[in-house]
């Protein structure tokens, strides 16, 4: 597969992951699937917008760049056939690095949130009863949270989704960094029609 075609495939995969990451983060603002009575009852890590910012907004830019690489004009620099495509592939490395940073941000926040556990009402006060991640292996501890209903599985499911999706996004952006390097050094496997040639660009 050409480097431009590979980038387009990666970009097409990043878009739905970015949308899902954003939706997962939005759902976390509704603990247990219900509207929170007080914003202070929402887990702190939700307010850092890992899914909306890191896995969403910062991932849309690389995805759009990757999608446009295959259609980039290969005669972009003073009629030089190779310059346009190679520069576009080089710029994709920079956008891929932005994507890796966004995915890493979401990944770290999700891991911290999973280890810390949800903020819930223990009957006495709103607190974090699972500070050391022990609730992940011991479901009996979930009963420490009296409300909101089903807050532990809600928290666990959504942050796990964010963790997995951001990991995949980081991997895809890492692949594009390597792909972009090959495209910069070796060119794409074919020239677009404006150059009137079939050779490498």
Model feature map: region roles:
Residues 1-2, 44, 84-85, 131, ...:
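Intrinsically disordered, low-complexity segments enriched in polar/charged residues with Gly/Pro
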Residues 114-149:
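Extracellular/lumenal N-termini and interhelical loops of multi-pass eukaryotic membrane proteins
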Residues 127-130, 152-155, 201:
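Extracellular/mature segments of secreted proteins
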Residues 192-201:
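Non-transmembrane, juxtamembrane loop and terminal tail segments
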Residues 2-122, 162-185, 190:
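Signature of small four-pass
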Residues 143-167:
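Individual transmembrane alpha-helix segments
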């Amino acid at each position: 597969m050409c480097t431009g075609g590979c980038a387009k495939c990666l970009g097409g995969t990043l878009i739905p992951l970015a949308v899902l990451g954003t939706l997962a983060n939005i759902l976390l603002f509704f603990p247990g699937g219900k509207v929170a009575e007080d914003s202070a009852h929402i887990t702190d890590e939700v307010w850092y917008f890992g899914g909306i910012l890191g896995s969403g907004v910062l991932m849309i830019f690389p995805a759009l760049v990757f999608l446009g690489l295959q259609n980039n004009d290969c005669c972009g620099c003073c009629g030089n056939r190779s310059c346009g495509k190679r520069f576009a592939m080089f710029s994709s490395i920079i956008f891929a690095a932005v994507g890796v940073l966004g995915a890493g941000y979401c990944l770290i926040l999700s891991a911290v949130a999973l280890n810390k556990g949800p903020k819930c009402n223990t009957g006495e006060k709103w607190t974090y009863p699972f500070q050391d991640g022990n609730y992940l292996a011991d479901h009996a501890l979930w009963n420490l949270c009296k409300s909101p209903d089903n807050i532990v599985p809600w928290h666990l499911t959504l942050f796990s989704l964010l963790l997995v999706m951001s990991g995949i996004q980081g991997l895809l952006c890492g692949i594009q960094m390597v792909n972009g390097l090959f495209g910069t050094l070796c060119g794409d496997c074919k020239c677009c029609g404006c150059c009137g040639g079939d050779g490498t660009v």
